[in-house]
């Protein structure tokens, strides 16, 4: 199984889990043409698309997903905000699991400034994969994880520097603190979960102004002893369960 990163920032987010025979799309925040290119224009293998919340950098192209015949899972608020409907539009119901091909999917609540979810995804090839972006915390703990995709948007230190330098508005501090994962929060989350079977940790949605990619990656590597990557367009990694 490969993880393909098409976008992981406020400009647009999209990831694909692809084993060659079937593919699951996470988020619809990049142009659909880019999705088709990443799939080698083989749309038949797409078994579904998962959306975390309604913001455009995650859901702008949700209509294209549905119109291409992909079963797409999202909160009711997303369908209302994007004014998209039809038999391929699946509404998340709390505590309910879903199956797309051989992918088992369990949504869980996240903490953002609009209704938002993360996903626990399981497949025979990649094992159990955790996916959380755009959330200031995670109230759940998980066992048996094999791959972790988690937001690490900013650090308090880099945010303070960016505000002082005028690169980030002071008003952004409160919003970030209540809607995105800070470095120390990311580290605390990882420390509180069993990572013994984890092969890869991928850091998502790093802020352009308020993060430090090399430092973030090295900090998480030092803490966990795992292979750590910062998500960026074009990144492809093998996420087969070891």
What residue ranges belong to the model's regions?
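Cap/insert and terminal regions of metallo-dependent hydrolase folds
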Residues: 143-234
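Metal-dependent catalytic neighborhoods of phosphoester/phosphodiester hydrolases
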Residues: 60-69, 83-85, 211-218
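Metallo-beta-lactamase
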Residues: 74-126
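Short, polar loop motifs at secondary-structure junctions
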Residues: 30-31, 55, 75-81, 93-96, ...
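Active-site environment of divalent metal-dependent phosphoester hydrolases
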Residues: 54-59, 80-81, 113-115, 137-140, ...
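Conserved beta-strand hairpin/beta-sheet module of binuclear metal-dependent hydrolase folds
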Residues: 1-39, 117-134, 146-147
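Divalent metal-coordination and catalytic microenvironments
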Residues: 17, 27, 53, 105, ...
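Active-site metal-binding motif and surrounding structural segment of the metallo-beta-lactamase
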Residues: 31-76
């Amino acid at each position: 199984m490969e993880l393909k990163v098409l976008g992981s920032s406020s400009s647009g987010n999209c990831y694909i889990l692809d084993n060659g025979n079937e593919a699951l799309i996470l988020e619809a925040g990049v142009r659909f043409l880019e999705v088709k290119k990443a799939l080698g224009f083989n749309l038949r293998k797409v078994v579904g698309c998962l959306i975390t919340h309604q913001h455009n950098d995650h859901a702008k192209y949700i209509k294209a997903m549905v119109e291409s015949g992909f079963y797409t899972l999202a909160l009711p608020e997303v369908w209302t905000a994007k004014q998209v409907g039809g038999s391929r539009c699946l509404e998340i119901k709390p505590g309910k699991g879903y199956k797309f091909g051989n992918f088992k999917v369990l949504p869980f609540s996240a903490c953002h400034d609009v209704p938002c979810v993360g996903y626990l995804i399981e497949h025979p090839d990649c094992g159990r994969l955790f996916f959380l972006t755009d959330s200031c915390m995670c109230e759940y703990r998980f066992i048996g994880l094999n791959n972790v995709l988690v937001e690490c948007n900013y650090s308090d230190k880099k945010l303070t520097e960016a505000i002082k330098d005028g690169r980030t508005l002071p008003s952004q501090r409160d919003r970030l603190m209540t809607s995105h994962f800070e470095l120390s929060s990311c580290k605390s989350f990882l420390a509180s979960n069993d990572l013994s079977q984890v092969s890869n940790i991928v850091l998502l949605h790093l802020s352009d102004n308020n993060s430090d990619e090399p430092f973030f990656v090295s900090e998480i590597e030092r803490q966990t002893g795992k292979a750590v990557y910062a998500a960026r367009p074009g990144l492809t990694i093998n996420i087969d369960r070891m």
